[in-house]
Structure formats: structure tokens, C-alpha cells
């Protein structure tokens, strides 16, 4: 079984459901992933109408590269690194933080020694906002990961423009070709 899991991690082309984990719980997890990914595609379509891809790309390319930024360094340390998460809600827990002082939370993470901060920007299921990441970026010096359901290259350029140093790519919702393309764009942007 270990070989099968390793194959999934390396190819990112198979789903856990294909590996004999046919439980109702797993099926529910995949259904919510697919639902959130579909919602993300709708958000991207609306965002492209407000700010076309070409403009998002131009803005992102004007920004400095983050190559060599502490995000890579944080993950390469010989000690265990930790990334703290700023999250208002989740599909499984519902509303986690009705009062949501996200900037204060980020400051406290940085003061406590976090190596990076993951900021949820997915709005429909996690009640995240791009604004959270932008305002946190203005406040802390440590690297920021935009945690969203990246389903289009547009979201990578947008992430750079709102202040992210890294993006989350979820293998289960991307084809191997998309994963390779999106990782390349992220590397190009630094």
C-alpha cells in the first residue's frame, strides 16, 4: 500500500478513492473538495471580469521576486519548522472565530516564532478574503502562504499581487499538467 500512496504523491494523477479507501467518509471528503473547486472556478470567472488576466499578469511581473525569500529557508532548516494558519471558518467546523482579529493573530504567530503563516482566502466555505492576506502582509515580515483552492493560473498571479510568497496547489483537484504549469508560474514569479 505504501507504494500506491507514494505513486499518488509523485504523479498527483490518482485519487485516494482509487486506492481502495472506498469509505463513505473519504467519498464525502472528495465531494467537498470537488464542490469547493467548482466554487473557486466561479470566483475566478467573476474576478477575470473585474480584472482581466493580462492585467493581473502585468501587475505581478512588476513586483519583486521572492526567490531566496525565507519561505524556502524556513522549510529547509534542520529543525522542525512550523506554519501557523489564519482561518475564520471551515466546512467541517463551521464558524471558528466570530470575532476575527486576523492581523492580531498573525502578529502573535510571528512573535511566537512561526516560520510562515498560511492565510485562508477562500470565501464561500472558509469565509476568507484576499484582504486578510494583504493586511497581514503589511504587518508581518515572515512569509505568507495563500491557502485557497487554486484552480486557474489567474489565482497565482492574484496571490502575488495581494502579497503572498507561496501558493497552495492541491493535487486532488489539478491534473498533472495543471500542477506542472502552475508550479512553473509560481517559480517564475519567485
Segments predicted by a language model, with ranges:
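Short hydrophobic targeting helices and cationic amphipathic motifs
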Residues: 6-9, 19
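An N-cap/entry alpha-helix motif that binds or orients negatively charged groups
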Residues: 30-97
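Alpha/beta enzyme core
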Residues: 98-117, 157-165, 179-182, 188-189
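Catalytic beta/alpha-barrel core
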Residues: 117-126, 143-151, 165-176, 190
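Alpha-helix-loop-beta-strand connector modules within alpha/beta enzyme cores
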Residues: 128-145, 182-190
